[in-house]
Curated annotation (Swiss-Prot):
Protein family (similarity comment): Belongs to the argininosuccinate synthase family. Type 1 subfamily.
InterPro entries given in the database record: Arginosuc_syn_C, Arginosuc_syn_N, Arginosuc_synth, Arginosuc_synth_CS, Arginosuc_synth_type_1_subfam, AS_cat/multimer_dom_body, Rossmann-like_a/b/a_fold
Cystine pairs: none
Gene source species: Thermus thermophilus (strain ATCC BAA-163 / DSM 7039 / HB27)
Keyword DNA-binding: no
Oligomer status and interactors: Homotetramer.
Protein name (Swiss-Prot/TrEMBL): Argininosuccinate synthase
Subcellular locations according to the entry: Cytoplasm
EC number of the protein: 6.3.4.5
Residues that hold L-citrulline according to the record: 84, 89, 120, 124, 173, 182, 258, 270
Encoding gene (name): argG
Length: 400
């Protein structure tokens, strides 16, 4: 039997690699995706080989991640439960897509992942796998093995000579990519406990951020960001640049309790500096370029799209149908937003667009601009008609 494992190089997937070989008598191919997590991918590849993988594949997927997953999601204005910009959720279908592809190329019968049986990631990985290859076998060791906790896993690692660099458990777990870093578990499981001050890796503490604000301009073309401060950049390079700018000023920290797809509530702390800047910049350009009813309709559909991404339905027909709508709307989003970054905050201070629907002569108090204010009287009376009828009926105590 041959299995392709999504391998990070950490404790869990290193143990899983050895466990798969022992339990299934299988040949294991390790796959590591570089999506901007900041870890040494080549080091993880070498570690996989030392741990017993017959082959280790490492791919740089940063551009594909941002171009084909993050940017389409951002065109939809997706935010889960009002705060979460979906940094972990959007990475899973990309990784699973390549897991399935490699399994097909290598003639493997199964894929495996290190997601636990309590979280969302198991669903995201497996829904993607079954959507792309319905007959694929998926192995989820966390749902099969008998380890009762980290101590038993560390003991297993030591007994099998697995090169785990640290045996001391961190007070929280962390997952990183080019869009964000997430923290959960351990000391963060108490929703009343403030996150440890030294936990954050991507952003400066807002209290210690520069005392002077920094301005940044983000240019959009047909829905996608294409330049920062006038410099055109590739999708991954653009997001990285904004991560650096936002991180310097403590932008993008979020601490929430969210509803997992599997039914439980979970506390998550996130850093999304570049994504937060892009969210505000996009809204600024959209305010000029989108018709009122289109914008309101888009905002009604965005939460459903975010839910689909969070749940793992990236390759589902309903997500694809919504994407077609959002992509059509985004074709009008061309322009520039100017923002001020200051001690954890993002302020929109300017916006412009070549096809702006904003007409200064119409809204100016100093110019008529072709708008007759007397027209408002009839408009208001028509809008008030149903309200007046309701009030009259209630006053009379009976209907017509």
């Amino acid at each position: 039997m041959k299995i392709v494992l999504a391998y990070s190089g950490g404790l869990d997937t290193s143990i899983i690699l050895k466990w798969l070989k022992e339990t299934y008598g299988a040949e294991v191919i390790a796959f590591t995706a570089d999506i901007g997590q900041g870890e040494e991918v080549e080091e993880a590849r070498e570690k996989a080989l030392r741990t017993g993988a017959s082959k280790a594949i490492a791919l740089d997927l940063k551009e594909e991640f941002v171009r084909d997953f993050v940017f389409p999601m951002m065109r939809a204005g997706a935010v889960y439960e009002g705060y979460y910009l979906l940094g972990t959720s959007i990475a899973r279908p990309l990784i699973a897509k390549h897991l399935v592809r490699i399994a097909e190329e290598e003639g493997a019968e199964a894929i495996a992942h290190g997601a636990t049986g309590k979280g969302n990631d198991q669903v995201r990985f497996e829904l993607t796998a079954y959507a792309l290859k319905p007959d694929i076998k998926v192995i989820a060791p966390w749902r099969e093995w008998s380890f009762q906790g980290r101590k038993e896993m560390i003991a297993y690692a030591e007994a099998h000579g697995i090169p785990v660099p640290v045996t001391q458990e961190k007070p929280y777990s962390m997952d990183a990519n080019l869009l964000h870093i997430s923290y959960e578990g351990g000391v963060l499981e108490d929703p009343w406990a403030e996150p440890p001050k030294g936990m954050f890796r991507m952003t400066q503490d807002p209290e210690e951020a520069p005392d002077a604000p920094e301005y940044v301009e983000v240019e959009f073309f047909e829905g996608d960001p294409v330049a920062v401060n006038g410099e055109r950049l590739s999708p991954a390079a653009l997001l990285q640049r904004l991560n650096e700018l936002g991180g310097r000023h403590g932008v993008g920290r979020v601490d929430i309790v969210e509803n997992r797809f599997v039914g439980m509530k979970s506390r998550g702390v996130y850093e999304t500096p570049g994504g937060t800047i892009l969210y505000h910049a996009r809204r600024a350009v959209e305010s000029l370029t989108l018709d009122r009813e289109v914008l309101h309709q888009r905002d009604m559909l965005s939460p459903k799209y975010a839910e689909l991404v969070y749940y793992g339905f990236w390759y589902a027909p309903e997500r694809e149908a919504l994407q077609a709508y959002f992509d059509h709307v985004a074709k009008n989003v061309t322009g520039v937003a100017r923002l001020k970054l200051y001690k954890g905050n993002v302020y929109v201070v300017g916006r412009k667009a070549p096809k702006s629907l904003y007409r200064q002569d119409l809204v100016s108090f100093d110019e008529a601009g072709g708008y007759d204010q007397k027209d408002a009287e009839g408009f208001i009376k028509i809008q008030a008609l149903r309200l007046r009828v309701r009030a009259l009926v209630e006053r009379e105590g009976h209907g017509a």
